[in-house]
Amino acid sequence: MRTGIIAQKIGMTSVFNDKGERISLTLVKVDGCQVVGHKTLAKHGYNALVIGVKDQKISRVTKPMKQVFANAKISPKTKLKEFRISEDNFIDIASILEVDHFSVGQFVDITATTIGKGFAGSMKRHNFRGLEASHGVSISHRSHGSTGQRQDPGKVFKGKKMAGHMGCNQVTIQNLKIFAIDTNRKLIMIQGSIPGHKNSYLLVKDAIKKASITI
């Protein structure tokens, strides 16, 4: 099991293949992704790499983290993330991970935070059909309708789909295929859409449920 990387979502575009089919692509940039530290089985109980990205002002770093970055002999980072790895996949501290960490045709899993939508109704949040547009319905056309039963149980069960805060959740999209890699621009072109807004940070890992390379 290899380490993943922290990347930045740039935006979306589309291309046409040899068959004339339109393929949607998400552009992901890998820039300054660096190994900050190691977690070992003997000391911490598991094997992992600590990956950092985006330089930070030294004045905004806490004293304990200043020592961590000083020991690694690298500049402070804003984003830090641990990636579990197998024992034979350690990478030297201060090493920089580039786009060639992955290959064209490989399947990856993307973890990102969805765009926040604020307080949303049941029709937008849970795809409810709503009530009738006429025939006796007043002021409640987009409401969710009944939420409970009767005197027994006399309550609304936890988990009932209702209006509430929508979005801003961490989700993982699995088995997305890498269409192309641009080493000069440090871009990975991934087929399909990825959660999150432009310039948001996300995690790219080898697909756990699918073969890494297609033949």
UniProtKB/Swiss-Prot annotation:
Domain of life: Bacteria
A GO CC annotation given for this chain: ribosome
BP-aspect Gene Ontology terms: translation
Modified residues (N5-methylglutamine): 151
GO function term, MF aspect, one: rRNA binding
Region (Disordered): 136-155
Entry-linked SUPFAM superfamilies: Translation proteins (SSF50447)
PTM description: Methylated by PrmB.
Keyword annotations of the record: Methylation, Ribonucleoprotein, Ribosomal protein, RNA-binding, rRNA-binding
Role of this protein: One of the primary rRNA binding proteins, it binds directly near the 3'-end of the 23S rRNA, where it nucleates assembly of the 50S subunit.
The protein's assembly and partners: Part of the 50S ribosomal subunit. Forms a cluster with proteins L14 and L19.
Family: Belongs to the universal ribosomal protein uL3 family.
Annotated protein name in UniProt: Large ribosomal subunit protein uL3
Organism annotation: Rickettsia typhi (strain ATCC VR-144 / Wilmington)
